[in-house]
Amino acid sequence: MAYAYLFKYIIIGDTGVGKSCLLLQFTDKRFQPVHDLTIGVEFGARMITIDGKQIKLQIWDTAGQESFRSITRSYYRGAAGALLVYDITRRDTFNHLTTWLEDARQHSNSNMVIMLIGNKSDLESRREVKKEEGEAFAREHGLIFMETSAKTASNVEEAFINTAKEIYEKIQEGVFDINNEANGIKIGPQHGATNATHAGNQGGQQAGGGCC
């Protein structure tokens, strides 16, 4: 289907925080509780609508293991948006955010939009990281912040779409050079069209994989 823009995303964070589950919930609207670990990088895509324009999201789901970190780094370079995910029930995944963020900012373009996601909000009784802590980290580092549940789908749609809205606003403001695909943005065949059909509910294809 024709689109006005293509935005490339990367999903990063420790193993087991639910990165693959978030992607699967967004692209296929389903939750798969048992997964193999993601090996290297997997891929998903979906069309959304922003400001009457079709936007294709091309989403790269990365492995959280240290042994795959060099592979992950190579995907930062062509990303317009990053979803940095931690698990609200595991304090260590929150403590590692600074390392992930430093890595992302070192290897990406300076305008990349980063959404901080506290996942597994359905497991409130096992919470180790307060929502206020996530909000404070996001404020300190200039990130967008949301808590999500890949299991119940709470805020999953919003996390992906709000990231896209932020990228779109930066395009309108002239922050992104849309002629440079290294910024993670590609102009599509529908660019400039005024009458876009709504495809916000259209799913994409996601390779099978782990919730890592």
UniProtKB/Swiss-Prot annotation:
Modified residue annotations for N-acetylalanine: 2
Residue ranges annotated as motif Switch 1: 37-42
Main location: endoplasmic reticulum
Statement: the UniProt record of this protein carries the keyword Nucleotide-binding: yes
Record: residues binding Mg(2+): 20, 38, 61
Keyword GTP-binding part of the UniProt annotation: yes
Region (Required for interaction with PRKCI), start-end ranges: 2-19
GO molecular function, one term: GTP binding
Biological process, per Gene Ontology: autophagosome-lysosome fusion; Golgi organization; macroautophagy; protein transport
Post-translational modification: Prenylated. Prenylation is required for association with cellular membranes.
Activity regulation (record text): Regulated by guanine nucleotide exchange factors (GEFs) which promote the exchange of bound GDP for free GTP, GTPase activating proteins (GAPs) which increase the GTP hydrolysis activity, and GDP dissociation inhibitors (GDIs) which inhibit the dissociation of the nucleotide from the GTPase.
Superkingdom of origin: Eukaryota
Positions contributing to GTP binding: 16-21, 38, 64, 119-120, 122, 150-151
Catalysed transformations (reactions): GTP + H2O = GDP + phosphate + H(+)
Bilayer disposition of the protein: Lipid-anchor
Documented EC number(s): 3.6.5.2
CDD domains per record: Rab2 (cd01866)
Class of enzymatic activity (EC top level): hydrolase
Subcellular location: Endoplasmic reticulum-Golgi intermediate compartment membrane; Melanosome; Endoplasmic reticulum membrane; Golgi apparatus membrane
Primary role: The small GTPases Rab are key regulators of intracellular membrane trafficking, from the formation of transport vesicles to their fusion with membranes. Rabs cycle between active GTP-bound and inactive GDP-bound states. In their active state, drive transport of vesicular carriers from donor organelles to acceptor organelles to regulate the membrane traffic that maintains organelle identity and morphology.
Domain remark text: Switch I, switch II and the interswitch regions are characteristic of Rab GTPases and mediate the interactions with Rab downstream effectors. The switch regions undergo conformational changes upon nucleotide binding which drives interaction with specific sets of effector proteins, with most effectors only binding to GTP-bound Rab.
Similarity comment: Belongs to the small GTPase superfamily. Rab family.
Name of this chain's protein: Ras-related protein Rab-2A
Organism: Oryctolagus cuniculus
